Amino acid sequence: MKVTAAFAGLLVTALAAPAPEPVLVSRSAGINYVQNYNGNLGDFTYDESAGTFSMYWEDGVSSDFVVGLGWTTGSSNPITYSADYSASGSSSYLAVYGWDNYPQAEYYIVEDYGDYNPCSSATSLGTVYSDGSTYQVCTDTRTNEPSITGTSTFTQYFSVRESTRTSGTVTVANHFNFWAQHGFGNSDFNYQVVAVEAWSGAGSASVTISS
């Protein structure tokens, strides 16, 4: 979730409101987790066996959604994707997203975003260079907020790509290793997904995951 809003209902599956256009994500094999924190804020459909999902949201979104597909247990393996992502005027991310169980942490590797950079309102940890670009790295502490274990206090880690892109390979290990210098557990992973998140404006995306 964005730094300035609580992330609730991580394990909730909500029916989606109909909308005219999709966000599409696919992976050839291995998908075994659906992230569906939607709350009827957009049109979310998926086919887990095919490794595809769609999401489209219209103006009027005033709360947070995070949807995506991935794996019940995350890893530091690289993820290759390509996307057609449109979030002009929307507070939104296209990111690798997940959780670490202990110490409990929520993380984002933000490849592209709309009109809000999460590192603009968080504590800077510096920068890391990976996959042809510098990433801003920042952290925030969420106190008594909803999490994967209920209400808890946990750390958020963000790497935000300066040269935003919608295709390429994310060398996840580069980010995990950098964050580990600042308290990230880098083990005992919970789920990990390629995700679309938004909490204002309108947008859509089309993504293919190939690793």
Curated annotation (Swiss-Prot):
How does the annotated pH dependence read? Answer: Optimum pH is 3.5.
Q: Where is the signal peptide?
A: 1-16
Q: Which UniProt keywords apply?
A: Carbohydrate metabolism, Glycosidase, Hydrolase, Polysaccharide degradation, Secreted, Signal, Xylan degradation
Pathway terms, separated by semicolons: Glycan degradation; xylan degradation
- The catalytic site is made up of 106, 197
Descriptive protein name: Endo-1,4-beta-xylanase 6
Q: Which organism is it from?
A: Aspergillus niger
Reaction(s) this enzyme catalyzes, per UniProt: Endohydrolysis of (1->4)-beta-D-xylosidic linkages in xylans
Which SUPFAM superfamilies did the record assign?
Answer: Concanavalin A-like lectins/glucanases (SSF49899)
> Which PROSITE patterns does the entry mention?
GH11_1, GH11_2, GH11_3
Name the encoding gene, please.
XYN6
Q: Which domain of life is it from?
A: Eukaryota
EC class, as a word, reads hydrolase
